[in-house]
């Protein structure tokens, strides 16, 4: 005999409330593009730094070495821009970090998606002779 059902099936755990995502109305925000050699992450925040929308090359559906392509960065930026526009974002200041190949493509696709791009600044961290870098690759 199968065990008796205890109650309605819910996705949330017992005693835990599910938070519904409220629609923010933020006309001006900041787009943070982190472009590494392996991936590109686009995060759109409000002026205080609270995340409104984000997307990455892996989140969009690319795996492995295809995540590091400019096309993957383009799709990630379009995806994040679409989500941000649902929250009312119309203008963004862009902060680019990292040496990856998807930097310029992500900025261009933010503009193409309908966001007005204000200032573009490079915030790549530069070491003042910090830790020792990894040894050279010999291929």
From Swiss-Prot:
Residue ranges of the region described as Disordered: 1-33, 118-139
A GO cellular component entry from the record: plasma membrane
InterPro entries: Ribosomal_uS11 (IPR001971), Ribosomal_uS11_bac-type (IPR019981), Ribosomal_uS11_CS (IPR018102), Ribosomal_uS11_sf (IPR036967)
Signal peptide start-end: none
Keywords: Ribonucleoprotein, Ribosomal protein, RNA-binding, rRNA-binding
Protein's UniProt keywords contain Magnesium: no
Keyword Nucleus tagged: no
Pfam families given in the database record: Ribosomal_S11
Compositionally biased region (Basic residues): 14-23
Subunit structure: Part of the 30S ribosomal subunit. Interacts with proteins S7 and S18. Binds to IF-3.
Family that this chain belongs to: Belongs to the universal ribosomal protein uS11 family.
Record's function text: Located on the platform of the 30S subunit, it bridges several disparate RNA helices of the 16S rRNA. Forms part of the Shine-Dalgarno cleft in the 70S ribosome.
HAMAP family from the UniProt entry: Ribosomal_uS11
Protein name per UniProt: Small ribosomal subunit protein uS11
Organism: Mycobacterium tuberculosis (strain ATCC 25618 / H37Rv)
């Amino acid at each position: 005999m199968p065990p008796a059902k205890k109650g309605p099936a819910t996705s949330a755990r017992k005693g835990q409330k599910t938070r519904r995502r409220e629609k923010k109305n933020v006309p001006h925000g900041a787009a943070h593009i982190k472009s590494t050699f392996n991936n590109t992450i686009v995060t759109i925040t409000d002026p205080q730094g609270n995340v409104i929308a984000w997307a990455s090359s892996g989140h969009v559906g690319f795996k492995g070495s295809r995540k590091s392509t400019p096309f993957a960065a383009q799709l990630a930026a379009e995806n994040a821009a679409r989500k941000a526009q649902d929250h009312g974002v119309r203008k963004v200041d862009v902060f680019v970090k990292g040496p990856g190949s998807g930097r310029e493509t992500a900025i261009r696709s933010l503009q193409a998606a309908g966001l007005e791009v204000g200032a573009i600044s490079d915030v790549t961290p530069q070491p003042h002779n910090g830790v020792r870098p990894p040894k050279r690759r010999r291929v």
